[in-house]
Amino acid sequence: MRATEFLIERWTKKTLDNYFDHKQDLDFKNSDVQVSEPFDGCILLKYKTVPDVARSFFRVTEYYDGKHYGGSDRSVSLVDFLDNWMDRAGNVDYFKFWDGFNIPDHAFRAWKRSAGGLTSAEQVMVDAVNRASKGLKKYCVIGVGGTDSATLRHEMFHARYYLDSTFKSQADALIQAHKNDPAFKAITQTLIKKLDYVNHVDEEAAAYLYTGSQMKLVFGTQAKHLVKLFQELDQK
């Protein structure tokens, strides 16, 4: 494609308006995030949009759980992140796709030590967590963007799994009892091969089953019998 054709295709009224609007308000403010504690130790940060929560959490999440960084002490640089996530067309769909995040306290503290300079979005997130975690011996940070109730339920599973030993034991018992179920295997394989999970795969599968949303679309299986079992954790 010649340069002039590229500009004609890319420079439309909509793309220009979006680009110019984006330049008007780049800085995050404390008012851009709502902070609450749904239950003891669970620090919930709610953002208006998916890009807002993803901008705030992408480095700490990749440090804790990412394919290229999870399980290591390496800091997550923006250059490496873009190299790993940008496709050949220049798209980084991470910031429009991932709408929920969960970070246990030990990972959050370790990431802060390695992170170096913070973006404005990260600084607002860190300040919010520092205030909310004051006096807490153990906590889990969850961040959600938008208003999807399934995303919130999914992240709440992770927080309960980390903070509530009884809940974790019951969830682990279900995982062990059904790890060889074809539906459970299908979920874990999709997580590993298509969604780039390396660590905490069984926990992640359990969180999706506990949520029970869009199972067929994402994993190719309804897994209704497993969804029922994991959702019954609320009744125990």
Identify the function of each model-found stretch.
Residues 49, 165-166, 179-180:
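Residues that cap or delimit alpha-helices
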